[in-house]
């Protein structure tokens, strides 16, 4: 019988003998002590992804009202060859804590992040903290922080790693989840991973992220000395306890400390909108603007952003690091945007702090849970007394999710084919340019294996949404669970709540008429016609698709169920007897 971590919690006994556990020759904990430590880690560490790393190293978990600097000793800086992970929510003070640590180290520092806007903001904060100066926005992009501090993007580091090879320094990897998040459209993550693995002895590393779930296995792999396969298998404690002991026995890591914080998302209210109904979304944002609310709008598709720009009017937009440098620097400097709305893509979804009490509406159009959390985190709130924020998320249909799976699986197919034969990358270059890069040192193409990891994570998440094809609002429910809320979708969560009420009213009136009728074929046809009108006029039923043909009784009953009517219509079968004439 396998013993799970749930069994450990309830002290359920196991039929496995002690002999199956392979412990280190000189373990830090004996078997019984390790079992108790597992219980302690489960109780104290809410993030499943972080538990294994907490088990094998040291860790501290702060409360939802603390800031990360309250639990980190600024002198507790990793030694050369070692690392630490700071995994805490957006707005918990990770940047401030890092700036304090930089002041306490004698090592040269390289700070990296993945977006120009986030880089400008770090420079502003560092200069303010170290020199007490407010730097003009137009200088942030080009300013230097001094001889011992270099602040660059991951993309810049990836192209200049030769400058730092063999040199001793402290490397601060902010927004480290980007190594997975960006791997599908860029090869820089693959280059960074290779640089880290090749230079572990001469650099100290601090990893920072607000979304550790997907990237934690990547960090564990980079920092692993031995037992990598067993460790990665045991990182999800839904596996049996034996595998955790095996992993503990063989896994050695350079990661010495994990800092994390509890989250409190009670200040966030989620609402759902139809991704194809731009007018409905724009009308809602306009109404909120009229009430004095600002909105941050994240879109995957620039063309949709342009449509929203035109409809909303009073709107800033940033779709590229290169074409809006002055505007990016100004937002980083002021920690707010000037217009009522800011429409953006991945340019501003990471690392940017927006301290603006009028920013109380966020729209996030994505199927990626990492991106979603990062965008929501741009609006900074007081951790002790947060203001209420409304977040609009798309109510993706099963068709939308299925299309996303098909697209990701097609990309995965190309990745695996190129992995087997890198020369195929030329064939796929137009469709998927981030598959490989040419390594001038080894003089052959290098496959972007991080893209494979990113796609595997994405596909697993999307497939999880389709476990029950009949389950409506699967993505929205997953988001609610991600934020520790009950996965219950109520009518008032929809932007089209008025249409839902209209649909239910029309369906109820049609059913009441039928209920009080003779219930013959003519009455049934009348009911079907009225239900079709209720569905087609409100676009609430069947993902808004129009009902054009004659509907069957099964569809009638499904519509009644959707309208909250607890009745079914069943055909009465008449039997005609035969007798002799």
Each language-model region and where it sits:
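The feature captures the C-terminal accessory region of ATP-dependent helicases
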Residues: 69, 78, 89, 101-102, ...
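Conserved helicase ATPase motor motifs in RecA-like P-loop NTPase domains
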Residues: 87-92, 177, 192-219
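Conserved Walker A/P-loop ATP-binding site and its immediately adjacent core
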Residues: 97, 105-128
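Conserved strand-helix element at the start of the C-terminal RecA-like helicase core
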Residues: 108-119, 284-310
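SF2 helicase catalytic motif II
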Residues: 165-195
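Interdomain hinge/linker at the junction between the two RecA-like core domains of SF2 helicases
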Residues: 215-280
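Conserved helicase ATPase core of P-loop NTP-dependent helicases/translocases
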Residues: 322-344
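Conserved SF2 helicase motif VI
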Residues: 368-389
């Amino acid at each position: 019988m396998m013993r799970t971590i749930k069994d450990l919690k309830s002290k359920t006994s196991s039929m496995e003998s002690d002999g199956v556990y392979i412990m280190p020759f000189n373990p830090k904990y004996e078997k019984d002590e390790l079992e108790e430590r597992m219980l302690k880690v489960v109780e104290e560490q809410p993030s499943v992804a972080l538990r294994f790393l907490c088990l094998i190293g040291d860790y501290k978990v702060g409360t939802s009202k603390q800031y990360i600097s309250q639990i980190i000793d600024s002198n507790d800086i990793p030694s050369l060859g070692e690392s630490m992970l700071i995994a805490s929510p957006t707005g918990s003070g990770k940047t401030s804590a890092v700036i304090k640590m930089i002041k306490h180290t004698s090592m040269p520092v390289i700070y990296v992040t993945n977006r120009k806007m986030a880089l400008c903001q770090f420079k502003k904060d560092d200069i303010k903290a170290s020199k007490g100066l407010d730097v003009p926005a137009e200088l942030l992009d080009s300013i230097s922080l001094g001889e011992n501090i270099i602040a660059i993007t991951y993309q810049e580091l990836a192209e200049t790693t030769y400058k730092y090879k063999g040199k001793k320094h402290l490397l601060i990897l902010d927004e480290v989840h980007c190594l997975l998040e960006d791997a599908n459209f860029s090869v820089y993550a693959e280059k960074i991973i290779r640089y880290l693995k090749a230079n572990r002895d001469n650099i100290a590393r601090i990893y920072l992220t607000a979304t550790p779930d997907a990237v934690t296995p990547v960090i564990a792999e980079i920092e692993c000395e031995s037992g990598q396969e067993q460790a990665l298998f045991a990182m999800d404690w839904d596996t049996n306890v034996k595998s955790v002991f095996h992993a503990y026995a063989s896994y050695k890591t350079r990661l010495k400390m994990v800092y994390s914080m509890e989250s409190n998302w009670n200040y966030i209210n989620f609402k759902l909108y139809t991704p194809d109904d731009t007018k409905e979304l724009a009308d809602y944002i306009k109404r909120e603007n009229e009430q004095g609310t600002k909105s941050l709008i994240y879109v995957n598709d620039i063309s949709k952003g342009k449509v929203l720009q035109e409809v909303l009017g009073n709107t800033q937009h940033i779709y590229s690091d290169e074409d809006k440098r002055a505007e990016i620097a100004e937002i980083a400097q002021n920690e707010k945007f000037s217009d009522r709305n800011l429409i953006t893509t991945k340019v501003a979804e990471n690392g940017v702090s927006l301290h603006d009490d009028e920013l109380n509406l966020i729209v996030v159009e994505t199927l990626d849970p990492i991106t979603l959390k990062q965008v929501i985190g741009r609006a900074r709130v007081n951790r002790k007394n947060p203001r209420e924020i409304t977040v609009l998320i798309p109510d993706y249909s099963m068709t939308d999710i299925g299309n996303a799976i098909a697209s990701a699986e097609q990309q995965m197919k190309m990745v695996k084919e190129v992995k087997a034969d890198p020369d195929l990358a030329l064939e796929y270059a137009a469709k998927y340019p981030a598959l490989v890069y040419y390594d001038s040192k080894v003089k052959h193409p290098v496959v972007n294996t991080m893209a494979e990891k990113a796609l595997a994570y994405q596909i697993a998440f999307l497939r999880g949404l389709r476990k029950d094809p009949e389950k409506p609002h699967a993505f929205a429910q997953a988001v609610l669970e991600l934020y520790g809320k009950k996965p219950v979708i109520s009518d008032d969560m929809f932007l089209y709540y008025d249409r839902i009420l209209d649909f239910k009213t029309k369906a109820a009136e049609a059913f009441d008429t039928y209920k009080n009728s003779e219930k013959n074929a003519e009455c049934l046809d009348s009911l079907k016609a009225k239900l079709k009108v209720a569905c087609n006029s409100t676009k609430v039923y069947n993902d808004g698709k129009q009902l054009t043909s004659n509907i069957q009784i099964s569809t009638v009953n499904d519509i009644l169920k959707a309208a909250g009517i607890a009745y079914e219509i069943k055909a009465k079968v008449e039997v005609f007897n035969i007798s002799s004439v």
